[in-house]
Amino acid sequence: MLTNDQLAQWDRETFLHPSTHLAQHARGEAQGRIMVTGEGCHVTDRDGNRLLDAFAGLYCVNIGYGRQEVAEAIATQARELAYYHAYVGHGTEASITLAKMVLDRAPEHMAKVYFGLGGSDANETNVKLVWYVNNVLGRPEKKKIVSRMRGYHGSGLISGSLTGLPLFHAKFDLPLDRILHTEAPYFYRRPDTGMDEAAFVAHCAAELEALIDREGADTIAAFIAEPMLGTGGIVPPPAGYWEAITPILEKHDILLIADEVVTGFGRLGSMWGSDHYGLKPDIMTIAKGLTSAYAPLSGTIVSEKVWQALEKGTDENGVMGHGWTYSAHPIGAAAGVANLKLLDELGLVANARETGA
């Protein structure tokens, strides 16, 4: 049996960890932890420490650890059909069922869902679809994406550029061109402590308007935002923020991408953060709570308006050349189906609303 010391040595010698001080970890200076089991809201490491996982992994294990129903669904799918791709119209019962379940829970104006693996790749997909749509609609100059400082949207080339945290840009030559950032609705960090919430909301709206005027509305394709800031502070927007922002987007024909990776599937006491704040997004990013992290899966939900442009594009140009090998992976989809069933059966969305958790 492997000892803790042997595993720790292998870890230092072989494993390049995400978001880690790599040199300190390799030298054994940064404390690591080797996890073994999880049950409910607790996890246990190899040293026998039982820990309250108040962060739910990376705010993703919405149904808690150790749900056997999801484990059995994964095992059954792996035994029956461990993999098949989703290219050129192929599907599985799990992927088709999950698509239906997601759209049944999505806002009424949403039309289709595309499945990937994680929130980062979903936001890469979102931006590609926005660019594709504007090319189809004869607006090749309308390609810039406005994100927000302190926002988090992943760590890929596009998604890392969308992220508004310097750590994810440093030494990576990010953000890329076409990605712009505006004020975050973080009241505590307001530029003038004399501002009340109403004044700060007006400031955020004015900053967005000024950016649009400076760049040209005809060059800006979309605005991406988490309904409530996640990694940037887990901070709700001040009262009236979204009511001030959405009319600006509508006036300038700028699509709204709601990044629901964290806020989706009940985290705010409603199925979507967009529901909580009364938003009507054109595209929604989903991941984390889609499977409660029992298997990797993400999604891009597109509105009827976006879908019509995608449909037009393929009628005019043929197959749309976008996809991942593991798009709609059947094991991930099976986990998603079982997870959403549990979310309903256990009343977890209502419980979050009632307890304020």
What residue ranges belong to the model's regions?
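Conserved N-terminal phosphate-binding loop of PLP-dependent enzymes in the Aspartate aminotransferase
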Residues: 1-357
